Regions:
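Transmembrane alpha-helices and adjacent helix-loop boundaries
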Residues: 2-380
Length: 380
């Protein structure tokens, strides 16, 4: 009996060690890609090998990388399909711009303004995620996707009629009409469909890198925590999770809110990268674009999403003459990915190739299985 207990303890220790080893590998690859890409881009920029137009895409690349990672938390780790990620991005963008303009009245230290604005954008976006998540997370599959899509469109249309500005006394005022009484044009922050104008551009490539590193840190630590394992167990078998007492709604809401907060931070940095930002920028196509990053990078694969987001943000700028066909190309690629995923023959072939090149492949997996079979025979 004692020998069997010791074997169980040692097998659990081995599983925990392997899980920790996988975490370290995934974290090392993700951080390595981000830091390596940052260094390479900086060297190429210093050498004058990157044009001005492509340099202007550095911050959007980082923003989309962060959005892909945060959406992976819902789609890959939680196993739910969300089509409203651009809505949380919009909430964070306009909230962050509003806070930056308020802080700019009395503060000139830009790093503090950026950090506070991003935290404020994350807070408002997480509140939106919490309010939206409570009633809708009882839904599953296509129904949840449709509701999140509707949420994204509601947010965009809400921004089209929202007006913020300072009055003659310096007080912040808002309205849901075409004019704000006693607010001069140069004191308006958000002007309905015209969007936010006069924003001081403070976002830089370095801030984008820090955002990506923070997003990877949060998602990987949540994924490998006790709560993350509960979320993934519910994803794999909801009924089994409920049967052992897991609060399904609580854990799904946790993933949804954290994902919304990270999207809000990314949206804030995106807003601080432009002097003018319009609500139409956060339409349905943006949500689909982020989902494309996740699917092409591999659902649940953090570093794959990083590569996909970076490449698909750079390529339209590189092949600008074909930019009109971008969404058509993404749609075709998505269809091909779905066909390859659900076709047994193609899937088996891809799985065979991936098994050979998988950096997370457990080389001792076969030995472990052999030991397990041997121990069962001894026990019998």
């Amino acid at each position: 009996m004692a020998e069997r207990i010791l074997k169980n303890i040692s097998s659990r220790g081995l599983k925990n060690a392997l899980r920790g080893n996988d975490y370290r590998k995934e974290a090392s690859i993700s951080y390595g890609i981000l830091l390596g890409g940052y260094i390479v881009f900086q060297i190429l920029t210093t050498a004058g090998l990157i044009g001005h137009n492509l340099q202007g895409q550095f911050v959007p690349i980082c923003v989309y990388v962060s959005l892909a990672i945060s959406l992976n938390l819902v789609v890959g780790i939680s196993g739910e399909l969300s089509l409203g990620h651009a809505g949380f991005m919009a909430v964070g963008a306009f909230s962050g711009i509003l806070m930056s303009r308020i802080l700019g009245q009395s503060m000139s230290f830009e790093p503090a303004i950026i950090i506070i604005s991003m935290l404020f954008g994350a807070l408002i976006a997480s509140l939106a995620g919490f309010v939206i998540g409570i009633p809708i997370l009882g839904l599953r599959g296509d129904y949840l996707a449709i509701v999140t899509l509707a949420f994204g469109e509601i947010i965009r249309n809400f921004m089209n009629v929202l007006y913020f500005g300072f009055d003659s006394n310096g007080r912040l005022r808002f309205a849901f009409n075409h004019t704000i009484d006693d607010v001069a044009n140069n004191d308006r922050i958000i002007t309905g469909a015209i969007g936010a104008t006069g924003t001081k551009t403070m976002a830089t490539f370095t801030w984008g890198l820090l955002l990506c590193l923070f997003t990877v840190f949060v998602v990987l630590n949540l994924k490998n925590s006790k709560q993350g394992r509960a979320i993934m167990s519910i994803r794999d078998n909801r009924i089994a999770g409920e049967s052992i007492g897991l609060d399904v709604r609580k854990y799904k809401l946790m993933a949804f809110v954290v994902s919304a907060a990270l999207a809000g931070m990314a949206g804030c940095l995106f807003g601080l990268n432009y002097s003018t930002l319009v609500p139409v920028k956060f339409n349905f196509n943006t949500s689909v674009l982020i989902l494309v990053f996740v699917v092409l990078g591999g659902v649940g694969n953090i570093w794959g999403g990083i590569i996909a987001a970076a490449l698909l943000t750079v390529l339209p700028e590189t092949f600008r003459q074909f930019s009109d066909y971008r969404m058509l190309t993404y749609a075709i690629v998505l269809i091909l990915v779905m066909i390859c995923t659900y076709n047994p023959a193609i899937k088996a072939r891809i799985t065979g190739v991936w098994t050979k090149i998988n950096p997370f492949k457990n080389r001792s997996g076969g030995k472990g299985k052999g030991k397990k079979r041997k121990s069962r025979k001894e026990a019998a």
